[in-house]
């Protein structure tokens, strides 16, 4: 039968075996099978009384009920800690479920995402409160800041023979928290110094996170004394995974946090930020922000994936109101004070510059198109790409300006090769004649906008190819299009990163039609599922392509 593997001498009295199987199946209907199996075994083993069987079944029922209640509490706690991030929370729930069924050894999470979106809050007010002892006390939480750190002694101390030496932060946490299994949150791991000393820090962290070694961690101050940190829970927090040592990154269970949507920011403003601001200013129920005002502040005065700048701005506005109330005791106020967009622009922020968003042109132009960019901080937008002929001694010499880095430069050369091979032979002959003529005008200068900002990566390869094709063939590019995608020598358009950031930022610039790689279909589907009801996507068109020829048909005006 289904439980025949449990029907062995010595196991019959151990309800825990059935409980383990029961939990593993996660199906409450299986309890009937458990009861039938107990009855069957009881018939074969007359030494078992009905009372003993009922007691074991009650234990199973009770244990399963406690687990169900606990997992429900876990979800509630995580939701209360931060708004949104459902995928990240689900991964944490899965790991906690694994701890219930399996071993409860230490673990290492990697919280990956832009700043200000709730990574620390989810760890401190969420995960910490989910992990409680039998007295209901939350697992102790400690934080270590690694941004710019260049000294390994921060973590594992100095040798005690040095004057003024002391132990490292890991031992200090154990001393402060009085336990060997705290939650240790190590922030800004991607900002660790790139020097040799920085490599030492990476080596220490790699040792700390290795389950085969972290049961014998040694602090230099306590030489020869092993510290068992195998039960500790480590959380590394970082913005850009590409800046982290690959061996260290391989040690962590990566959990990606997405940028907050406009709706997310609205909810967080009303449920978390404003109540906190009002409380600190002593102005509860005395000020009111409508949704339209909050949207205006978010769109016009912040350019971020999270809510740090938004929180700072709301503190500033409420602080101004508080100051006004304190200075004008004789003035009568109609509470709650309703903040308007006019108040923001003409009173509180009359000297503050709004975020400047460069709009895409209205006219179709030759040798000009809209690329797209995304940063590790979760921002994105359009990247204007210009190409013009210039006098040159070399036919089709490329002059690359705008602080382009190595990968982007290589992409430019590939784009030129592809664009040249797409150009009709008659047009090639015309260009050669121009080069041989007295004008001597056939070098090409390619310049992406914002010349003071470094740019790198292959994702602009596709749009650069179209810009060069436009220039070589004297054909304008549709102004309201934007494209992202890496170009291959074959003309294939391949996957890129940060698609959602690129689209959201480009919408602000006035882009109406988007071209993206077919290989990014999953990324686009995730994006569209989240934003399909957003007003900003009304009348916006999206096209997926896997070859540059498809993009040419869409974007080149003929």
Language model regions located:
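Peripheral, non-AAA+ core regions of ATP-driven protein-machinery
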Residues: 336, 358-370, 378-558
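Walker A/P-loop
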Residues: 108-145
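Conserved C-terminal "switch" segment of AAA+ ATPases
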Residues: 64, 133-136, 178, 240-250, ...
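C-terminal helical "lid" subdomain and adjoining coupling/linker elements of P-loop NTPases
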Residues: 279-286, 299-374, 455
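AAA+/P-loop NTPase substrate/partner-engagement loops
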Residues: 131-165
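AAA+/SF3 P-loop NTPase mechanochemical coupling elements
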Residues: 177-181, 217-237, 287-289, 440
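Pre-Walker A (pre-P-loop) alpha-helix and adjacent loop at the N terminus of AAA/AAA+ ATPase modules
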Residues: 68-112, 419-420
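Conserved catalytic/switch belt of AAA+ P-loop NTPases
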Residues: 190-226
């Amino acid at each position: 039968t289904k439980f025949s593997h449990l029907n062995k001498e010595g196991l019959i009295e151990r309800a825990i075996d059935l409980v383990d199987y029961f939990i593993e199946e996660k199906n409450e209907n299986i309890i009937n099978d458990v009861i039938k199996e107990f009855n069957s075994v009881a018939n074969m083993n007359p030494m078992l009384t009905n009372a003993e069987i009922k007691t074991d079944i009650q234990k199973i029922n009770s244990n399963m009920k406690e687990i169900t209640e606990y997992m429900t509490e876990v979800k509630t706690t995580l939701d209360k800690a931060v708004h949104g991030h459902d995928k990240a929370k689900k991964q944490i729930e899965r790991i906690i479920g694994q701890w219930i069924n399996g071993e409860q050894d230490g673990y290492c999470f990697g919280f990956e995402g832009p700043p200000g979106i709730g990574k620390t809050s989810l760890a401190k007010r969420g995960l910490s409160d989910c992990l409680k002892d039998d007295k209901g006390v939350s697992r102790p939480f400690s934080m270590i800041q690694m941004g710019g750190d260049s000294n390994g002694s921060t973590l594992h101390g100095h040798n005690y023979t040095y004057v003024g030496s002391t132990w490292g932060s890991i031992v200090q946490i154990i001393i402060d928290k009085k336990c060997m299994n705290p939650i240790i949150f190590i922030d800004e791991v991607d900002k660790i110094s790139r020097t040799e000393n920085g490599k030492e820090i990476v080596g220490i962290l790699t040792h700390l996170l290795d389950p085969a070694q972290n049961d014998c961690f040694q602090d230099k101050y306590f030489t020869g004394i092993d510290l068992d940190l195998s039960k500790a829970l480590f959380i590394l927090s970082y913005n850009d995974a590409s800046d982290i040592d690959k061996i260290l990154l391989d040690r962590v269970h990566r959990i990606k946090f997405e940028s907050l949507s406009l709706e997310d920011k609205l909810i967080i403003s009303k449920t978390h930020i404003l109540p906190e601001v009002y409380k600190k200013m002593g102005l509860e129920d005395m000020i009111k922000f409508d949704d339209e005002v909050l949207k205006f502040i978010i769109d016009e005065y912040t350019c971020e994936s999270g809510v740090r700048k938004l929180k700072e701005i709301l503190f500033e506005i409420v602080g101004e109101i508080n100051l006004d109330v304190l200075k004008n005791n004789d003035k009568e106020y109609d509470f709650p004070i309703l903040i308007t967009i006019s108040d923001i622009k003409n009173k509180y922020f009359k000297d503050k510059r709004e975020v400047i968003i460069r709009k895409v042109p209205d006219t179709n132009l030759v040798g000009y198109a809209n690329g797209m960019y995304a940063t590790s901080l979760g921002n994105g937008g359009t990247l204007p790409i210009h190409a013009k002929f210039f006098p040159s001694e070399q036919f089709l010499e490329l002059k690359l300006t705008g602080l382009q880095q190595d990968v982007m430069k290589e992409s430019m050369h590939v784009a030129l090769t592809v664009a040249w091979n797409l150009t009709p032979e008659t047009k090639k002959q015309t260009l050669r004649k121009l080069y041989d003529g007295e004008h001597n005008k056939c070098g090409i200068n390619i310049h992406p906008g914002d010349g003071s900002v470094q740019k790198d990566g292959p994702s602009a390869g596709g749009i650069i190819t179209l810009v060069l094709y436009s220039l070589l063939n004297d054909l304008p590019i549709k102004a309201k299009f934007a494209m992202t995608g890496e170009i291959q020598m074959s003309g294939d358009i391949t996957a890129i990163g940060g698609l959602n950031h690129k689209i959201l930022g480009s919408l602000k610039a006035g882009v109406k039609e988007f071209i993206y790689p077919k290989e990014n279909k999953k990324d686009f589907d995730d994006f569209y599922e989240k934003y399909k009801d957003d007003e900003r996507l009304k009348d916006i068109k999206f096209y997926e392509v896997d070859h540059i020829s498809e993009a040419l048909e869409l974007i080149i005006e003929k």
